[in-house]
Amino acid sequence: MKKLSFQQIILTLQNYWQDYGCAILQPYDAHVGAGTFHPATVLRCLGTKPWSVAYVQPSRRPGDSRYGMHPNRMQHYYQFQVILKPSPDNIQELYLKSLECLGIDLKIHDIRFVEDDWESPTLGAAGLGWEVWCNGMEVSQFTYMQQIGGIECRPVAGEITYGLDRLALYIQGVDEVRELDWNGQVGEKALKYGEVDFEAERQFSKYNLELADSEMLLRHFKDSEDQCERLIKANLPMPAYDECLKASHAFNQLNALGVISVTERASYVLRVRHLARICCTKWLEMNK
């Protein structure tokens, strides 16, 4: 069987979950640290209304900046997120079938669910979870979302997060992300992952670790914090949540620069968590 290109992996997952009944959404146009931060997860997992969606989410973690030199760790990477609310009884079976659609033979390969309860301190989110390992390499995270913004999720939503970059490493049998086949073409049309993303990886790493202005980022954090509070008072939880995301990213940038002490870090986490909580609380009040 021909190995899937990076974009074919995405298309295969989109088609699989579309056939199951998920709405295929688009990436959120904000700097987020993971697919979970998309409002389609944070806000829509709350309340009783059924919600089944899937989407790709480019994600940024300034602290993982490596100037494009690390084989599988980058400050910018891709996740494929699936939310099923309420969580179906056969969600694990659905996930395993999706791996088969990607060409992974479950009879040959060692697929393990390794207990790893998930928590996001800044979102005030948590759930029972498992890392999914394929032949010893983590390729997905599987979570029963029980709490977001400090609010219980009723019903519990099932969350599946595929690490697209690492999953592609395994499927294509290569050792470095930059060597991944991006588009499945040959000759002049062929593209590798490195040709698409790695110059940006180098430049953003330099910015994140050397050139970002900490004083400016501190101002941005406070401005977003104040704006979020103001928008909540105006009953606008969705734009308020955008400001929460901006504050969260500013905090991540400050953390990557190493300008925040351990004590200050705990304080910033609590401040972002407060913003997430008031956004979630207001959203739920307006969407019961």
Curated annotation (Swiss-Prot):
GO biological process, one term: glycyl-tRNA aminoacylation
Family: Belongs to the class-II aminoacyl-tRNA synthetase family.
PROSITE patterns recorded: AA_TRNA_LIGASE_II_GLYAB
Highest taxon of source: Bacteria
Keyword Transmembrane helix tagged: no
Assembly: Tetramer of two alpha and two beta subunits.
Record field: catalytic activity: tRNA(Gly) + glycine + ATP = glycyl-tRNA(Gly) + AMP + diphosphate
Compartmental location: Cytoplasm
InterPro entries in the cross-refs: aa-tRNA-synth_II/BPL/LPL, Gly-tRNA-synth_heterodimer, Gly-tRNA_ligase_asu
EC numbers on record: 6.1.1.14
Protein name: Glycine--tRNA ligase alpha subunit
GO MF term (any one): ATP binding
One cellular-component annotation, GO: cytosol
Keyword Lipid biosynthesis: no
Keywords for the protein's UniProt record, in alphabetical order: Aminoacyl-tRNA synthetase, ATP-binding, Cytoplasm, Ligase, Nucleotide-binding, Protein biosynthesis
